[in-house]
Design a protein with these regions (language model features):
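Membrane-proximal, lumen/periplasm-facing interface regions of secretory-pathway glyco-
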Residues: 265-311, 321-336, 340-352, 356
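Short acidic/glycine- and proline-prone juxtamembrane loop motifs at membrane-interface regions
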Residues: 20, 26-31
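Hydrophobic/aromatic-rich transmembrane helices and adjacent perimembrane loops
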Residues: 24-25, 74, 185, 208-257
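Membrane-interface transmembrane helices that cradle and orient dolichyl/undecaprenyl
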Residues: 3, 38-57, 65
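Luminal/periplasmic acceptor-recognition loop/helix of membrane-associated glycosyltransferases
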Residues: 309-323, 331-404
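Transmembrane-lumen/periplasm boundary regions of multi-pass, lipid-linked membrane glycan transferases
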Residues: 75-190, 328
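Transmembrane-embedded, aromatic-rich helix segments that form part
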Residues: 35, 56-62, 71-89
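Short helix- or helix-capping micro-motifs
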Residues: 11-16, 62, 66
Length: 404
């Protein structure tokens, strides 16, 4: 809908073998639904020029995108308002269109509960409780967090993600192959430059330029990265436009080579495809072998089995890794009412200091024979060993206990 068929094929190929997309698909992080929702929303939005019913599907996708990641709350309205403005400017949509206002109602219905959540939790209105739904006052709202970084620090961080292809987090970016392979940024930059040039040329001629929509989402991702300190999954809305631009960049590169080396036209395309395929095979080999070991601790390998042993002991369970309390609560299946009645909050609100017989220690606890300890990889076990504790290894976790 935006580029030609050859670019679409290249973009589809890049998406299938792209490290970022593969890791995003395998790691079930809820925020990683956002890029797909925005992509479907954009697709149906563009198809609306052919048939007005697609606007309703676009509104549905953009409405669902609001629930995929709080980060997009600000950018979905921007994308929709500027997109509608551009279609009206180009005469492809009229302000009085029933499909336009019908779609606006759909988005508004999806957005209304989120607006109420903000109004309740910022103290503008009281809690809402009805027979059909309720909106409580939450103990903690992540949208209230501030990042405390300057514009230039954010820019440096974003540049590291886009050009060095890493945010330093093993679960987000494989250090050896990057997010779209080391050479991939060259084709993306070519595609970006070509997209901007094509849009500017068509704008001056008053021609319809679908590149506008691709650049719009890219700029939203760029603005997000410049105004907050992001990591790969937080700025994930930028990567699908970049991959499409990468496909466009390959097509531009192959066309240029065909112009100066007409006899080698086919081989240039084959060479580009082979370069990506070889890189993909190398990445796949790394991903299912070395990376699995490197990332085991980050994904708390063995935690479930260690907790099962701890529950059998009937003793107090100490966990010394911060930030994993939701996973612990899920594994032990603690009833909600027990959690609410026994939780004690720490200074790192909303993480509890304890709940039931579970203790979440920000610092490693001292040996206690009345408790068992689940320690992260690399923890100092010497004090426990000196006290006669035994150690069992479960994945990346050490299960430490005293045997009577």
């Amino acid at each position: 809908e935006i580029m030609d068929e050859e670019t679409a094929l290249w973009a589809m190929f890049l998406l299938a073998i792209n490290p970022w997309h593969i890791m995003m698909s395998r790691w079930g992080l809820e925020s990683n639904l956002a890029p797909g929702m925005l992509l479907f929303g954009l697709y149906f939005f563009l198809r609306g020029s052919e048939s007005r019913r697609f606007y309703f599907l676009s509104a549905l996708m953009y409405g669902l995108a609001l629930y995929s990641y709080a980060v997009v709350w600000m950018y979905v309205p921007i994308i929709l308002l500027l997109g509608v403005w551009y279609l009206i400017r180009e005469g492809r949509l009229t302000p009085k269109s029933r499909s336009l206002w019908g779609s606006a109602v759909i988005v508004a219905v999806f957005a209304a509960p989120l607006v109420l959540v903000l109004l309740v939790n910022y103290g503008y209105i009281g809690e809402i409780q009805t027979r059909f739904f309720s909106i409580p006052k939450l103990d903690f709202l992540r949208t209230s967090q501030t990042n405390g970084y300057t514009f230039w620090q954010n820019a440096e961080n974003l540049a590291g993600i886009l050009f060095l292809q890493s945010d330093g987090l093993i679960w987000n970016s494989p250090t050896k192959y990057g997010l779209y392979y080391s050479f991939g940024i060259l084709f993306i930059m070519i595609g970006l430059a070509a997209s901007i040039h094509s849009f500017c040329r068509k704008w001056k001629r008053r021609e319809y330029a679908p590149e506008f929509f691709l650049l719009l989402q890219f700029l939203c991702g760029l603005f997000l990265g410049l105004t907050s300190h992001v990591n790969v999954n937080r700025v994930n809305i930028i990567f699908l436009p970049m991959l499409i631009m990468g496909g466009y960049g390959i097509e531009i590169f192959c066309s240029f080579c065909a112009h100066i080396l007409p006899r080698w036209t086919k081989w240039v395309s084959v060479g580009a495809a082979c370069l990506y395929l070889v890189s993909f095979l190398c990445f796949a080999q790394y991903y299912f072998t070395e990376y699995r070991q490197e990332s085991a601790a980050a994904f708390d390998s063995g935690l479930k089995d260690a907790l099962a042993e701890g529950e059998k002991s009937g003793k107090t369970i100490h966990i010394n890794k911060s930030g994993i309390y939701p996973k612990v609560l899920y594994y032990v299946q603690m009833p909600v009412d027990e959690y609410i009645n026994t939780r004690v909050f720490s200074d790192w609100h909303p993480m509890p200091k304890s709940a039931g017989n579970l203790y979440f220690d920000m610092e490693q606890a001292e040996p206690d024979r009345n408790g068992v300890f689940i320690l992260e990889e690399g923890a100092d076990l010497s004090a426990f060993v000196q006290e006669g504790f035994e150690v069992e290894k479960y994945g990346s976790c050490s299960y430490v206990y005293y045997s009577e």
